[in-house]
């Protein structure tokens, strides 16, 4: 049996009310399922008035109640499904957002998205749905065994021995926790997520698809990704089907043996007509329940892969978070020592820096020298114990409060698939006075003409480069940060538009810290401080 997992325990605690309700409704369904055949047996075994209206009405009344309860259960299940998937998908992404920056890049965001979807589907269907169903199956089996014991002791023994016989035979086939099914289940989830991720990345660049869509390399990439995933899926399914076929053969042999034995008992007067009808009704139900209980172990192998993804790839890679709330930033200082990606890839060996309110800092250096890596230390995307904000170690600050005050803008703007207004506000309450002031800026004219309700399409394909930057600038204004980091943010637009936006930004944030990474002297000439990274050394001028 699978070891307990922190994530699975959290889910049970959170949804125990729904799980218990689910179990209660299933108990009622189970009760009607059990009592119906018993009532029919009693009717058939009755020596007098066996088929009177009252007895027949009772039986059909039970059947009606059974299906009414099933109808109610289906509505409850659909409601529970919607609630669970909505809540847990959001909560799981919240966990993803707490992961280390480097780990998200290492796993790749699209891969993580695919694994999250697979995890939610697997956890819901197997942990929440199947396990409650197993409890009901066990109750049906116990009730059936009790009734069979009452009817015929020898038949009871035949029914009872099926459980250990099938269970231990199944365990032998699975070969314990480290079975092929466990390995296939985990590896298939990873490979399927990787395949879907790669295909989505290929299709995400519409320009590339249109330009090179008939190029064999693109189609070969899609084909290779599909082949790898589908080949493993075929291997896994073939093995699983082999196991299931053996189990099904054993189950059918045992079930048919039970039928033959029941008929034999009836012919020899060991059971009555009512007993014969009852046993025929419950025989399939009983063996299906045994199958449900045993087959859940196959499903638990898939569940294990999903739970391991949450615990080992997400939760074990949470970034460090301080508990000190940052209300404002007046100064940033520190030293850059051995900054990079491990001992073998050091980008900056040494250097000191110091910024204060009102500073506009330009950062220059050759491509790949560590400019972006350096600025990502300032918002804790990358970790360092040598950065100080207002004289305190940056690692002591709460990540959320820090990132509300330090805004990092990469070259590729981060726009969401929602309205322009929502992209500006980013879920914040509207500060009416600040909003009215924003709308009066000249750079907002073109955005207002096109409409704040305009929906941003994938990759912001319906917006010009200049409009994208203006939306980001408007978002900045509404966020009111203390530090703005521009990482070649204006490279996608012409210099005239970029310089105009930079002038606006400087005018708005005269008492803030502005940091710009750029190769263009036009932007660097606006700076009162310059940092150059050269020969793995960070040097601050002025």
Predicted regions located by residue number:
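An intracellular "coupling" helix at the cytosolic face of ABC transporter transmembrane type-1 domains
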Residues: 11-17, 101-102, 118-127, 131, ...
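Helix-to-loop junction immediately C-terminal to a conserved catalytic motif
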Residues: 379-380
């Amino acid at each position: 049996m699978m070891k307990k997992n922190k994530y699975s325990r959290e889910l049970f605690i959170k949804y125990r009310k729904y799980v218990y309700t689910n179990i209660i409704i299933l108990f009622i369904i189970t009760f009607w399922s059990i009592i119906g055949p018993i009532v029919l047996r009693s009717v058939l075994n009755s020596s007098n008035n066996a088929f009177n209206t009252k007895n027949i009405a009772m039986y059909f009344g039970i059947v009606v109640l059974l299906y009414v309860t099933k109808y109610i259960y289906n509505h409850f299940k659909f409601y529970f499904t919607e609630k669970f998937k909505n809540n847990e998908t959001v909560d799981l992404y919240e966990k993803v957002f707490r992961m280390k920056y480097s780990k998200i890049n290492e796993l790749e965001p699209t891969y993580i998205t695919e694994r999250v979807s697979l995890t939610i589907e697997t956890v819901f269907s197997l942990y929440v749905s199947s396990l409650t169903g197993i409890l009901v199956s066990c109750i049906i089996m116990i009730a059936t065994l009790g009734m069979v014991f009452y009817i015929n002791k020898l038949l009871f023994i035949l029914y009872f021995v099926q459980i250990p016989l099938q269970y231990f035979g199944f365990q032998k086939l699975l070969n314990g926790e480290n079975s092929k099914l466990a390995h296939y289940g985990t590896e298939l989830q990873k490979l399927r997520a990787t395949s879907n991720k790669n295909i989505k990345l290929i299709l995400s660049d519409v320009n590339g698809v249109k330009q090179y869509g008939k190029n064999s390399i693109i189609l070969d990439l899609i084909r290779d990704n599909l082949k790898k995933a589908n080949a493993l899926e075929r291997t896994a399914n073939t093995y699983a089907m082999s196991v299931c076929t053996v189990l099904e053969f054993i189950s059918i042999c045992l079930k048919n043996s039970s039928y033959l034995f029941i008929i034999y008992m009836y012919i020899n007067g060991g059971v009555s007509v009512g007993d014969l009808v009852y046993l025929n009704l419950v025989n399939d139900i009983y063996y299906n329940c045994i199958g449900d209980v045993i087959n859940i172990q196959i499903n638990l192998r898939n569940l294990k892969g999903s739970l391991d993804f949450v615990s080992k790839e997400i939760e074990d890679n949470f970034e460090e978070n301080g508990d000190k709330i940052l209300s404002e930033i007046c100064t940033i200082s520190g030293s850059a020592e051995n900054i990079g990606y491990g001992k073998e890839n050091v980008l900056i060996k040494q250097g000191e820096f110091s910024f204060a309110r009102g500073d506009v800092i330009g950062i220059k250096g050759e491509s790949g020298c560590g400019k972006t890596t350096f600025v990502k230390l300032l918002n804790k995307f990358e970790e360092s114990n040598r950065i100080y904000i207002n004289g305190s170690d940056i690692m002591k600050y709460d990540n959320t409060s820090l990132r509300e005050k330090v805004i990092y803008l990469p070259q590729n703007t981060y726009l969401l698939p929602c309205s322009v207004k929502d992209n500006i506000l980013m879920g914040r309450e509207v500060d009416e006075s600040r909003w009215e002031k924003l709308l009066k800026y000249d750079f907002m004219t073109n955005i207002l003409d096109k409409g704040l309700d305009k929906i941003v399409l994938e990759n912001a394909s319906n917006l010009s480069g200049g409009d994208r930057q203006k939306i980001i600038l408007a978002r900045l204004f509404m966020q009111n940060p203390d530090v703005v980091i521009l990482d070649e943010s204006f490279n996608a637009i012409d210099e005239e538009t970029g310089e105009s936006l930079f002038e606006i930004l400087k005018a708005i944030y005269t008492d803030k810290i502005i940091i710009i990474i750029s190769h263009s002297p036009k932007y660097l000439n606006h700076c009162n401080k310059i940092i150059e990274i050269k020969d793995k050394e960070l040097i601050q001028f002025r």
